[in-house]
Amino acid sequence: MKSIVFVALFGLALLAVVCSASEDAHKELLKEVVRAMVVDKTDAVQAEERKCRWYLGGCSQDGDCCKHLQCHSNYEWCVWDGTFSK
């Protein structure tokens, strides 16, 4: 009788461990899916980037910045150059 109770308790403990491991695996899978979605959106944005840098984008020279922007000498980011042409 004692051995049957011991086997039953051992089986329940084993089942609890397996379920816990399964839940952890599910959480890890969910994290991987979310990471993949974020990476895909980042890649899509990078694919649509222009060859020039937008306002406050990092730069090393004026040619890096888009039209009507220039590279700020101290902070190395693109700022408005003060022009208004179309």
From Swiss-Prot:
The lineage of its organism: Eukaryota, Metazoa, Ecdysozoa, Arthropoda, Chelicerata. Residues 1-21 form the signal peptide. It comes from the Eukaryota. Belongs to the neurotoxin 10 (Hwtx-1) family. 17 (Hntx-9) subfamily. GO terms for cellular component: extracellular region. SUPFAM superfamilies: omega toxin-like (SSF57059). This is Omega-theraphotoxin-Hhn1b. PROSITE patterns: HWTX_1. Expressed by the venom gland. Residues 22-50 form a propeptide. It comes from Cyriopagopus hainanus. The presence of a 'disulfide through disulfide knot' structurally defines this protein as a knottin. It is found in: Secreted. It holds the Pfam family Toxin_12. One of its GO terms (molecular function) is ion channel inhibitor activity. The keyword Flavoprotein does not apply. Disulfide bonds join 52-66, 59-71, 65-78. Ion channel inhibitor. InterPro entries: Huwentoxin-1 (IPR011696), Huwentoxin_CS1 (IPR013140). Keywords: Disulfide bond, Ion channel impairing toxin, Knottin, Secreted, Signal, Toxin.
